[in-house]
Amino acid sequence: MRNIIRDRLLLYSAFLIPLIIIIFTRLVIPWISENVAPMEQYYSLLFMLIVITIPLMFGFVIGFLIMDERDENLLTVLRVMPISRNTYLLYRMLFLSILSLIYIMLFPLLTGLVEINLLEYLPIALLLALLTPTLGLIANIVATNKVQAFAVFKMLGGVFYIPLFAFFINNDLKYLLGIIPNFWTFMAFDALLKTGNQDYLFLGIGFCLHIVFLAVLFYLFNKKN
């Protein structure tokens, strides 16, 4: 927590920007829909487009915190400490992933874009929150400095939005996008909104894919560092 407070940019990213996103969504989108062009039919798509920025933002924070600690050789020091490095990293990622989950859970309540049962929404929110450690680990595996990390975050931000194009593809070709983990999250969310029931196949594939991704990323991160 001290590292977040120490770096004002990360503080803004972790706490203020998600709030700004929520306020913008609550006020601006309904105004546009009422005064410029009707947008109600696209609210679910807009919800997915905007809510994913929350785990991506917290992933940005995790990535830079880990990079700071790597530059300060803290991760090397942890090799000889009673607490294992993996335990420390899990604590780091769990803390910010929980914060991400809280914002994601509050998002439908505070924005009003969709009406959804929060208990039914919870598995989808958990899947979205798993993007937080995923993004942070990828950035630290690929990038060797913060300049490169910014480029990686920008690229990954675009990649995780690609599954939204599935809603404009009317055949099974859309499942080619299933290699991107949050594709299954979006599919599960869309099914829940349309039917009122969970699609456990989409959820199951989503959780399995995220777990595999995180396991591979942990392995690659430890191998690099």
How would you label these PLM feature ranges?
Residues 1-5, 188-189:
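A short amphipathic helical element positioned immediately N-terminal to and/or at the very start
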Residues 3-31, 45-61, 153-166, 204-214:
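Hydrophobic alpha-helical transmembrane segments of multi-pass membrane transport/permease proteins
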Residues 8-11, 127-162:
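A structural motif at transmembrane helix-loop-helix junctions in multipass membrane proteins
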Residues 24, 187-225:
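Alpha-helical transmembrane segments of multi-pass membrane transporters/translocases
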Residues 30-41, 111-116, 186-195:
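Membrane-interface helix termini and inter-helical loops of multi-pass transporters
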Residues 42-80, 84-107:
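Hydrophobic alpha-helical transmembrane segments of multi-pass membrane transport proteins
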Residues 47, 55-60, 90-91, 116-124, ...:
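Short alpha-helical transmembrane interface motifs in multi-pass membrane proteins
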Residues 85-86, 93-144:
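Alpha-helical transmembrane segments and their short interhelical loops
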